[in-house]
Amino acid sequence: MDSFTYELLHPVKIDVLTPDSTVIVGDLESYEFANFMERNVNCIISLGREHRDVILRFRANGYDTGYQPVHLSGNRRAVYFPFEDVKLRRMSTINLDDVEIVATQIRMVMRGDTIVYNADAFQLSQGSMLDELVRKLPGVQLDGGRIMVNGRFVSSLLLNGENFFTGDPKVALDNLPAYMVDKVKVYDKSPEHDYITGKEVLDELPLVMDVQLKREYNTGWIANAEAGYGTHGRWLAQAFGLRFTDNTRLALFGNVNNINDTREPGTSGNWNSGWLANGLTDMRYGGVELLLKDKQDTWKLNSYVKGLYEGINHESKASAVNFLESGDTYQRIAKNSYMRRNKLISHHNLDLKYPQSYVNIKAYTEYADGNTDQLEQSAEFRDNPKEGYGHSILDTLFSSIKSEFVDRSLINGYSNAELARQRMFRGELKGEAYIKIGNLPDYVTVNFVGNYRNILNTSYSHYDLLSGNGGRSFQNRYSDHPEVRIDASPTVTYNLDLPVGEKKLRLIPSYKLKYNYNQGNRNYYRLDYLDGWNTADAAPELGQLPSNNSLMQAALDATNSYHSQQTTLSHLASLSVGYFLTDTRILAIRPQVHMQYDRLDYRRAHIDTVATRNYTSLGAALQFSDSDFKLTYGYTESKPTLLRLLDIRDDSNPLAIRLGNPDLKSTQAHQFDFHRYFTNEEKLRNITWRGEYNLYMNAIAQSLTYDPITGVRTYQPKNINGNWDAGSSVNITQALNEDRSLILTSNTGVNYNNSVDYVAIDGMNESTKSCVRSLRINEGASLSYYDLSLKGNVQWLHAESQRAGFETLNCFDFYYGLSGYLNIGSLELSTDFTVYSRRGYADKYMNDDNLVWNIRAERSFLPKSNLIVAIEGFDILGQLSNVQRTLNAQGLVETWYNSIPQYAMLRVIYRLNREPKKK
């Protein structure tokens, strides 16, 4: 490492000398792991057992030569011999040959398993944030903060190799300016403890996206602020500040807005109505993050605190058709709700690195409270009201106006005014330690996870139920539902490496103890049992309770109230056996035995029982993998919870009754997965092929008994067989020309699902088995050339069933369009055009075309372009609808939401950065 900056050096030449300076092995070169984080620099040295005392000589370009004596023990299994860090001094004078620098704008390169994107090669408007850059990266998909690269989910977003806001990508995506970014790397991240465990792992490494800042922003501070106002009362304001040094990072951000939208004009985001955010949201959130570490990287502290407020006004009106054998039923549903939620979250992470051990401690806390005020009205009919989603029929239903259609066709209807409140506190503590055993390759892992959760839910409800025979009942309901949950789980693992000729055998015995305690009560009151509380007109205002405790006890609904206390103690023993055929090719098997004790103390009306259970289940996993492929098989077995096995009846919702089932059996699952990777760095080709097959035995489905007279549905869990699914996907990223400016991305997927379930048959009392076979084929492609991008996607769904009354589906959903960026002097334009189409639907209104056009224009001011003014137009042609239609095997649902797809916004952005003074 550098003696001044403590930065690890690479490449480094290493020679092994005898004490009299005779060269034993020379010109060995260090190597980096595939994740390209500089701290992962190693060199493998193989020596005979006759060498006990040697001298290592280190040579790096631009540095003086360094030496380090090492004593090797005689233990035959010893492979690691630690010594102090070797610090190399920079040479005082360095003579360089003449070089010619040619500027290029290659957008992406591949280095082993790492994809490196050059941020400067992607043209973005001056005010762009990181999310707009990420959307333009070939092979990358961004959906509401979730990032997919070549079909794989990105688990964390890093900043200069370190977790940023605990890996929460949305903070960085929304607040980090794109102009600060130098490179974006995507790779499988080795764990922090790999210097203890080595780089050979049996489990799959997490995929991360590492945002590398430009050198001038690695030390100093930056800040930016933005404000905007638009049509329909849309507004936003946000601020972000970041302070960097080599060993510290401080970030602060704040954001208030009511736009409820994360998409940007000129990007590849989805703009069809199915992706519109539902409702109107007033959101306010902010946070602070602190990172501290020492130069030697022996300790690191990362803390993050975030506060959030949300106010959501949600309105919807739905028209539904329920497909039944002897005749469809028709529903009209209207909801109007306002939800308020506050949340405070904190994450803390401490890493401690010692020569022979690694310790990590994580702490997480969360506090949330909120309330929901909602009115829901619904009606189910035998005939179609044929008045769309105007829902005037609901107004007629709950008024004194008489309707011949309602009298003839109504099955049931209800109006439910509800006020709900929730308070929750959660705490979690995790600790893990990796301890190396002397000079051996063996190590011990000790892990602990502890959780505490305390939840209180309360709700008030005025429920008015109408029956098709003209009957009417009013329920004045109140419930409180406190719950306490405690989990504790220590794990001990020993990792043992044994030489087997030229190969290696890894044995990993593991033992895990898990304790779980869950206490949940529901006190359910029918206030309509009391005089003066039993009619909609006379009942006190929603949210009030009787002041007399005896009245509360008189209103207690014992049938739907309960006390539940569950305790679980489980032991999980496993043995992983990995046979290393080569350094990368591994054959592994992991059998496991799970022994569990369950105890349930449950009291409810006529039930007062203590149920206990001891059982043993088996599991297994097989894996055959190499650097470019992986084949896995897994078997799991799970028991139904004791609560599901109780013979109970819950009719707190008079139209949806739920039963237990003492006859439930264990569920078994078989899972097969195949991954194959093809890469060609020279041609910039990346192909990922995946396949999977899943078989479920004794799966638990919800059996449904339907009463066609009253419309009451009774649900009961039952075991069912015949469920399985299979799928395959191919993701391709390929440069089509020599300078890599023309890049093709293709995502092809085929999925087959054999779904066996219980469905209601109109006119019959019992559910019958139904098998629906569905085939879904999807092809999506994009072609990008500098600042222009073409995109298209087509999805075909075929579903069939032998169930009487089932209509075979053959539906196409597809879109095509283009997006681009244009610089006209000081004016920057970003725009996108996309046509969304549907074909093959029985409902003619679903076979439609929508042209969506969005545009953004901006201009920068001041000498350093610190001030930016932008105007955005969303859905300029006004073809996006806030009506969504969904068709599946169970029915057709058409829903209107109070979203605003079309609007314009003026935004003003100011940014400031200060670099340290050059010495």
What would you call each of these model-derived segments?
Residues R146-D194, V208-L213:
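Periplasmic plug
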Residues F36-G48, F83-D85:
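Exposed aromatic-hydrophobic patches
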Residues G167-K170, S190-G233, T248-K919:
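Primarily recognizes Gram-negative and organellar outer-membrane beta-barrels
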Residues S3, D20-S21, T65, D98, ...:
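Coil residues (strongly favoring Ser/Thr
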Residues T114-L137, L159-F164, E226-T231:
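Short, polar/charged loop or turn motifs at beta-strand boundaries
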Residues S21-N42:
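Short, acidic Ser/Thr/Gly-rich low-complexity loop/linker segments typical of extracellular
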Residues F4, D15-P19, R57-N61, Y80-Q123, ...:
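Short, acidic, small-residue-rich periplasmic hinge/interaction motif at the N-terminus
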Residues S21-V23, I44-L47, D53-L72:
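A short, solvent-exposed loop/turn motif at the edges and junctions
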